[in-house]
Amino acid sequence: VMVSNSYLDGSYTELNPNIPQNEEGFKHLCKIFSFPGGIASHAAPETPGSIHEGGELGYALSHAAGAVLDNPDVIAATVIGDGEGETGPLMAGWLSNTFLNPVNDGAILPIFYLNGGKIHNPTIFERKTDEELALFFEGLGWKPIFANVTAISEDHEAAHALFAEKLDEAIEEIKKVQAEARKGSAEEATQPVYPVLIARIPKGWTGPKAWEGTPIEGGFRAHQVPIPVDAHHMEHVDALLSWLESYRPAELFDETGKLVPEIAEIAPKGDRRMAMNPITNAGVIKPMNTADWKKHALQFNTPGEIMAQDMIEFGKYAADLVD
């Protein structure tokens, strides 16, 4: 997500001029994605705008809380799949609102995405009723707002309009809570009750409905590769192209492979772009003190000459870092 968004808004090319916004640049980006010597398949430290690794699930809320501490004007919109919602760290993360002061800190807007399926299993939360989910989240100090996209998923325009309406409602609620709290001091503030947006959306929405008689959209088979095509198995490439062309790329990109101006204009500008946000790129705010690791390197001539513990030696370097 971070790679595709930053490429489309131009920031990826600003950071990597060897990947221009044209057909050749797009091909190169696709080539190096999840490829040896290329870029990671999930968010990684080198991914522009990334604040955590995307492959291991469970830390989204905790990292979002860290991003808004002492940043009172920031809202961290945090998308959580219902599969990630079942992990231990994520369940504990719902309590991160305990540590947020509505005067000094920003807010988290969890967007809990209920699609009903993990890679091979159904999920628990999607099988709960809205009433059960409301009781659960209210008990944890959140105010649930529901967006049932699944019920109107065949009408894409109506679905997007509904989700936009619920997002506006959530942001307005956050601003209302903060405005009331900021009439007083941080010392007087109590734990805020921020909204959680619970969105029921089909897994693999807008993907293939089925493949060879087996349902795809709305089930676990929508995960990752819905149509079996690779460099050595091209017999179904026409079906793949038909699906991808359903998104009408010819209306989004010009003949050179660049996003058309009327679409590009919608994107935020400057450091409002996802990959250029100073909060996610702390190293650009001020130089980082990385200390001199050479001072702590062990000097030896033959293997086994020195007996040492790695954590103790690294601890000396870490102490130098924070000195």
Predicted regions and their residues:
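Conserved acidic/glycine
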Residues: 1, 5, 84-87, 107-109, ...
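Cofactor-binding active-site loop characterized by glycine-rich and histidine/acidic residues
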Residues: 1-102, 126
